[in-house]
Amino acid sequence: MVKIRLKRMGSKFRPVYKIVVADARAPRDGKFIEALGHYNPSNKDFVLDSEKTAKWLANGAKPTVTVWNLFKNNKLTESLKAKK
């Protein structure tokens, strides 16, 4: 199963996350298929390639709960559902 999830990056106590498409069995910070964007929780910076995300959702990738909540908080769920 393919998931859209967060990959932790950054330094200790200052996380920055990449939003990636990865195999569900791969480690959290391991190999991924494609990067879709990034999220910085300290300054709430959120960047996402919505076309790539819509393509992966249409192909059956499942977002994790945390990623789906990020989509909802940034009001992207309706636009992503419409592009499906």
From Swiss-Prot:
Keywords: Ribonucleoprotein, Ribosomal protein. Signal peptide: none annotated. SUPFAM superfamilies: Ribosomal protein S16 (SSF54565). GO terms for biological process: translation. One of its GO terms (cellular component) is small ribosomal subunit. It holds the Pfam family Ribosomal_S16. HAMAP family: Ribosomal_bS16. NCBIfam families: S16. Belongs to the bacterial ribosomal protein bS16 family. This is Small ribosomal subunit protein bS16. The gene is rpsP.
